[in-house]
Amino acid sequence: MNKWSDAAKYLEEYSPADDEMISPAAVAALGDAYAHLNQLDKAVDSFKKAASMADKQSEEGANLSLSATFLIKAGEILESQNKKDEALQLYQDIKKKYVNAPAAMEIDKYIERATK
């Protein structure tokens, strides 16, 4: 667990730039560190922020390679916290906004799981 704490510390100190890939990935890595440290609300916030950053820097307004993946991670954590309505909203947003994203190919199974 100490390495995850160290990772979170270093990633919290990272200054994101205005790029489409590296900065959003670093913020998502912080989300992964928080998830391993069981700081789940912080993890969800980090994944949502990473998706937003990736979209903001994308020429199309939606980063199909990263954003859907980050939002699915956030949704899975929300499900683990029994926040299925919030997870469902994320999954539905993915289905609507990231139609052509590789990660969205199986989004229906996430939607179905969150509605049970």
Residue ranges and their predicted role:
Residues 2, 16-24, 52-67, 94-107:
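Short solvent-exposed coil/turn linkers within tandem alpha-helical repeat scaffolds
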